[in-house]
Amino acid sequence: GLVAWLERPKNPTAGGWKVRVADQEINGIHGLLKGDVDGDGKVDLLANSAQPVGAFPNSGAWLKVPKKPRKAKSWERHIFARNDAPGLSHYLGIGDVNGDGRADIAMGAKGGPSDASGMGEWFYWWEASNDPPKPFTRHKLPGKHPGATCIQQAEGNGDGKVDFIATRGHGLGVIWFEAPTWKVHDINPDLEFPHCLQVVDMDEDGDIDAATCAYGSQIAAWFENDGKGNFKTHIVAKEQ
């Protein structure tokens, strides 16, 4: 595997961008996310190490940005989920779930025929330790979720608690988990292979909406939140 960043030249349209390597040992990188993991005000990188082989099998990692990223041969690697993310994990979410001021991390794992472990089809979140270089504590979200891929922290129903919005990108449906019991609610149960997810206030009414592209259904859609966790599907385009 390879995690790298591309340095933009002064004129971004003239010639190539410089490739800077951050890590070469994480294996099976399907998701890459930026976020401040250790609370130092600087953006770090997060990646999954989804393959069951290699130096960090079935794991999740974050990479601390060095003081001189242009000169560093690699970034300082920390494993937040060591061997406890089996089942072909996909994408990551970052945000303070439990209100302790630290950045927690979430992932989904698709499972399915290519998952030799038979331990996928889940959404987990990892509670940040009080010393972020140390491993985080894993928490399982309810249910079995064939094809689980995307998950992001978001306040879904206006109660001030951080919830999760998620998609089963190799399966069916867009859902959200309601804190603190993580009750599962359907946003759209019928979309096939919604393999991406964005959470944002689309209509600028003060609550968080969601958007996805479902390549099985060949639909791009966004989901309007009424502020109480009830979502209405709006089709942006078909045959996509």
Model-derived features: positions:
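Beta-propeller-forming repeat regions
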Residues: 1-240
